[in-house]
């Protein structure tokens, strides 16, 4: 690979790192061609981009990017694949689902919405992270529930009051 080609790859990686709020680093070494193809299909279905990258080029792209990747560059040893997604937990779900059939891919680290996770033990934590849309949905649901409770109380309360008044008027009448 010439210097110009390396510079182009670094530039492309830097742009991808800047565009995506969710970046996972995984080790897919040891997977045969069929398993790798199945992993790529699973990533495509989950709207996750998967690419094998050279550690040195990715490290330089991380340095050039405006984000603070903290300890993440320290995991750039051995085989590294980068998984990019708009959703924070999509790559983790793909990895967890795929590991039901195989020991790989191993999670090396992740950068999710400015938070850094290093190591495979964070996989379950990352699977349970809610996406921005899910959190917004939960907040909207919480905000709507008190209003619904007040409306239902008024509806049921109004019926009770009318029933009591009717009963009292019948007793007097």
Swiss-Prot record:
Ribonucleoprotein as UniProt keyword: yes
GO BP terms, alphabetized: translation
Keywords: Ribonucleoprotein, Ribosomal protein, RNA-binding, rRNA-binding
Keyword tRNA processing found: no
Molecular function per GO: large ribosomal subunit rRNA binding
InterPro entries in alphabetical order: Ribosomal_uL10, Ribosomal_uL10-like_sf, Ribosomal_uL10_bac, Ribosomal_uL10_bac_type
GO cellular component annotations of the record: ribonucleoprotein complex; ribosome
Subunit structure comment from the entry: Part of the ribosomal stalk of the 50S ribosomal subunit. The N-terminus interacts with L11 and the large rRNA to form the base of the stalk. The C-terminus forms an elongated spine to which L12 dimers bind in a sequential fashion forming a multimeric L10(L12)X complex.
Entry function: Forms part of the ribosomal stalk, playing a central role in the interaction of the ribosome with GTP-bound translation factors.
Similarity comment text for this entry: Belongs to the universal ribosomal protein uL10 family.
Protein name from the UniProt record: Large ribosomal subunit protein uL10
